[in-house]
Amino acid sequence: MYNYLDFEKPVADLDVQILELKKIAQEKGSLDMSDEIARLEMRSQTALRDLYKKLSPWQKTQVARHPDRPHFMDYSAQLLRDVTPLAGDRKFAEDEAIQAGFARFKGEAIAYIGQEKGHDTQTRLRYNFGSARPEGYRKAVRIMELADRFGLPLLTFVDTAGAYPGVSAEERGQAEAIAQSTAATLRLRVPVVSVIIGEGGSGGAIAIAAANKVYMLEHSIYSVISPEGAASILWRDPARAKDAATNMQITAQDLYRLKIIDGIIPEPLGGAHRQKEAAIEAAGDGIAAALKSMIGKDGETIKQERWDKYLQIGRSLA
């Protein structure tokens, strides 16, 4: 059984009926219930399709945060080969919320940076729920500089509610670390492709997403602040997160229309968590196409195109 979201209750009810019928058919081998099961399965798929055709921004936020949604380590396992992770920022400590290193993607050498949230209590604590500390962003800068030195394309996978806001992180220069990471991305003379695979929250996401090509999965979100944070500021009530999400234009569809991102990667029906391998494969195809579009361009051209991209975004939204 899936972990159903609250708005998926009609689908959940049908799926429960399907499981009950399958159990009865198994217990009473002489009873043929295949036609009834097939009918209910068709109704379930239709209900799911109808739901996902008209998701609200808040519902998309829930899908982006689904506990079973594939995270960076899932993408790494399926898309990357010969992975050589690097650890530490050479200044303070290692931060596992940001995974980084070198690997091969479809046979080509690349550098990678990915934000990992974890899948269970143990791994979520290990990765700090995907909220990186300053040393994580300084490690990211270290990888960026190595990628630039060796002429390796950089792939980044964004999935964070935001950078860690704790006192210790602020004492070690969280804002400066985020700013330096963003600036370092813009300086690179190698192709940079970023995919927002779940949440793209605030500066914690932007720090590794100032790429030549930025893609979002169909049901991911990308914003300067979480809906709960915006609701707390605007209405002093985090319970109004649904209202905030509706007005913030945080969905992939909104951001593609505003020309903030370069494309939307389709997800399987019902979200990436229902067919993880298919969702990851689609993301890999999008990354490959983005890299192919930059083949033959020299470093200065790649860098200038990145600068021009973000200057144009600033002008168009001013």
UniProtKB/Swiss-Prot annotation:
GO-annotated biological processes: fatty acid biosynthetic process; malonyl-CoA biosynthetic process
Pathway named in the protein's UniProt entry: Lipid metabolism; malonyl-CoA biosynthesis; malonyl-CoA from acetyl-CoA: step 1/1
Location within or outside the cell: Cytoplasm
GO cellular component, one term: acetyl-CoA carboxylase complex
EC number per UniProt: 2.1.3.15
InterPro entries given in the database record: Acetyl_CoA_COase_a_su, ClpP/crotonase-like_dom_sf, COA_CT_C
Entry annotated with the keyword Cell cycle: no
Chief localization: cytoplasm
Catalytic reaction equation(s): N(6)-carboxybiotinyl-L-lysyl-[protein] + acetyl-CoA = N(6)-biotinyl-L-lysyl-[protein] + malonyl-CoA
Subunit structure: Acetyl-CoA carboxylase is a heterohexamer composed of biotin carboxyl carrier protein (AccB), biotin carboxylase (AccC) and two subunits each of ACCase subunit alpha (AccA) and ACCase subunit beta (AccD).
Purpose: Component of the acetyl coenzyme A carboxylase (ACC) complex. First, biotin carboxylase catalyzes the carboxylation of biotin on its carrier protein (BCCP) and then the CO(2) group is transferred by the carboxyltransferase to acetyl-CoA to form malonyl-CoA.
Similarity comment text for this entry: Belongs to the AccA family.
PANTHER family: ACETYL-COENZYME A CARBOXYLASE CARBOXYL TRANSFERASE SUBUNIT ALPHA, ACETYL-COENZYME A CARBOXYLASE CARBOXYL TRANSFERASE SUBUNIT ALPHA, CHLOROPLASTIC
Name of this protein: Acetyl-coenzyme A carboxylase carboxyl transferase subunit alpha
Source organism per UniProt: Bartonella bacilliformis (strain ATCC 35685 / KC583 / Herrer 020/F12,63)
Underlying gene: accA
